[in-house]
Amino acid sequence: MQEENQHPEQDDISEAQDAGAAGSLDARIAELEAQLAEQQANVLYVKAEGENIRRRAAEDIDKARKFALEKFSSELLAVKDSLDAALVVENATVESYKSGVELTAKQLLSVFEKFHITEINPLGEKFDPNKHQAISMLESDQEPNSVISVLQNVRPE
């Protein structure tokens, strides 16, 4: 017991150091908690901003698609008008119908060109599944796996 009380000043200093260290640790913990809260708020902000960007991009894509479809549709109306005009002609000859259909086909091709839809003619080419769609396989005098008949020859570029 005597040894415990021999250096009371040392005990006071040790307790003071411990109290100072605890206060310093409490301050450091409070500082780190504040930084953590700030970073969590930043994460939430960045996440919300990312969602806003995705939403705006989706809206822009929808608007562009709608505008393109409206423009394409309005261009096709002129083709439909030409076809309707051919239906109301009385006493038309086969030659006049043929001429009208040719002009209407040119009008339609013009619309296709305007919207980058091109006409292709793969007859005789080797079948490419990336460009062509096969309906069936038929025996032919042509090279094996080549296109021998075309049902649709217009496609987007």
Curated annotation (Swiss-Prot):
Signal sequence region: none
Pfam short name (any one): GrpE
Gene3D superfamilies in the cross-refs: 3.90.20.20, Head domain of nucleotide exchange factor GrpE
Compartment(s) where it occurs, according to its Swiss-Prot or TrEMBL record: Cytoplasm
Ranges of biased composition (kind: Basic and acidic residues): 1-10
Region entry Disordered, spans: 1-21
GO molecular function, one term: unfolded protein binding
InterPro entries in the cross-refs: GrpE, GrpE_coiled_coil, GrpE_head
One Gene Ontology cellular component: cytosol
HAMAP family: GrpE (MF_01151)
Family: Belongs to the GrpE family.
Name this polypeptide is given: Protein GrpE
Gene: grpE
